[in-house]
Amino acid sequence: MRALNVSRYFYLIALFLLGHSALAQDLKQEKMEQLGFLVGEWIGTTKVFENGVVTKQGSAYENISYDLDQNILVIELNTEFLQLRTIVYYNVEDQKYYYHRFSKDGAARYPAEFKDGQLIVWKDDKTRFFFGKSADGGFREYGEQLIDGEWIITFEDTFKNTQ
């Protein structure tokens, strides 16, 4: 009789863990779907700013797609000045996105959040990147630095979807 109670106890624990895992997967899928507006083959322009003035401008190409059953978002950026490969995913335990950036100079991981319809990546307390929809159906990616209490734009990429 005691063995029956123990096995029932383990059965209930297993059932609870399976249910919890399914809920976590649903939350992760929902969070990743919020980034769906970024998916596409994008062509546009990139601008680099110094002190509010454009110092470099060129063409930009970005291919963004889901991978691993929509558990990650893969961003391939190529501009005249920069080539990046980035993986974005949502961590259920931390309840935040992570932005893994890879370039020829190395790799980094930054926390991110989805707020007001855009992905906001925090490199540090004074540097952030935004990924958001534009009014014309494209998307805009830009970076800012906090200088003397004011957010100053450092780069801007604007894209139109070719798909």
In which residue ranges do the predicted regions lie?
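Bacterial Sec-dependent N-terminal signal peptides
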Residues: M1-D26
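N-terminal helix-cap/turn-to-beta initiation motif at the start of protein domains
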Residues: L27-I43
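Central antiparallel beta-sheet cores of small beta-barrel/beta-sandwich binding domains
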Residues: L27-Q29, T45-F130
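A short, compositionally biased
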Residues: G40-W42, D94-Q95, G137
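Asp-box/BNR beta-propeller blade signature and adjacent active/binding-site loops
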Residues: A60, L82, G137-R140, I153
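Low-complexity, intrinsically disordered Gly/Pro/Thr-rich segments
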Residues: A135-D148
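Edge beta-strand at a domain terminus
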Residues: Q145-Q163
